[in-house]
């Protein structure tokens, strides 16, 4: 049995990945700001804000680390307030960095792997995405820096999704017209789901010959122009 630390295990991609790990017999230490409602003998849960959490309760060995929290804050650039830039950065980048600091010793002890999440909007310039693209760009920089610094002991990778059908994206997919428009923007003519992103993330956690990579799982949006 392997042990994974999943930040943001309560919903969306983090929850889907947690369920995959538990289903195959792994142990999960989950941390979220509210209860997940998941019940499993191999799941240990902590309820805290990652920006304030002291790291107590982590096991001495971690085979894997997942940081799944994110934000969707889309608007014209001139409309962003300083606190919105700050919030997006804290949720997406600073939280990941602080969690990784807490987990580093245990990851090194187990020769483990870390998984973060970026967005297609970092490499594919998109209107109204300035704040999230800036924050997730920091995540990609963190991935590559730590992959170099922690090699060969710990691998670090990220998945970069496009719009995914999760609770976080419900406002963007909340009616048929919006959902159809979002699907049409993708070469594969649909949006992804949390299970598809979770399986991609699991592949990066499991493959011992991948590090420092950002894998686009985006329905072809980043590279195809049909």
Language-model segments: residues:
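Conserved NAD(P)H cofactor-binding loop of Rossmann-fold oxidoreductase domains
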Residues: 68-74, 220
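C-terminal substrate-recognition "lid" of short-chain dehydrogenase/reductases
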Residues: 190-217, 222
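Substrate-binding pocket helix/loop in short-chain dehydrogenase/reductase
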Residues: 76-77, 81-86, 178, 182
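A glycine/serine/threonine-rich, flexible loop-to-helix segment
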Residues: 163-185, 225-226
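Catalytic loop of short-chain dehydrogenase/reductase
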Residues: 111-138, 143-151, 163-164
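N-terminal Rossmann NAD(P)H-binding glycine-rich loop of SDR-like oxidoreductase domains
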Residues: 10, 14, 18-19
């Amino acid at each position: 049995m392997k042990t994974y630390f999943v930040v943001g295990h309560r919903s969306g991609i983090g929850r889907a990945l947690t369920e995959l790990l538990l289903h195959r017999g792994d142990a999960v230490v989950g941390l979220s700001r509210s209860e997940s409602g998941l019940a499993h003998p191999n799941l240990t849960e902590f309820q805290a804000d990652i920006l304030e959490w002291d790291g107590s309760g982590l096991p001495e060995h971690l085979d894997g680390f997942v940081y799944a929290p994110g934000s969707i804050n889309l608007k014209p650039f001139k409309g962003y307030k300083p606190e919105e830039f700050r919030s997006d950065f804290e949720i997406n980048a600073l939280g990941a960095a602080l969690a990784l600091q807490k987990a580093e010793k245990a990851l090194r002890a187990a020769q483990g792997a870390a998984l973060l999440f970026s967005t297609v909007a970092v490499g594919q310039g998109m209107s109204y995405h300035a704040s999230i693209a800036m924050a997730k760009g920091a995540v990609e920089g963190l991935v590559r820096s730590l992959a170099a610094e922690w090699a060969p002991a710990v691998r670090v990778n990220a998945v970069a999704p496009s719009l995914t059908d999760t609770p976080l994206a419900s406002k963007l997919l909340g009616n048929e017209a919006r959902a159809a428009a979002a699907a049409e923007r993708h070469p594969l003519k649909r949006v992804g789901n949390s299970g598809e992103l979770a399986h991609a993330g699991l592949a990066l956690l499991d493959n011992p010959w991948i590090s420092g990579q950002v894998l686009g799982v985006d329905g072809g949006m980043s590279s195809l122009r049909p």
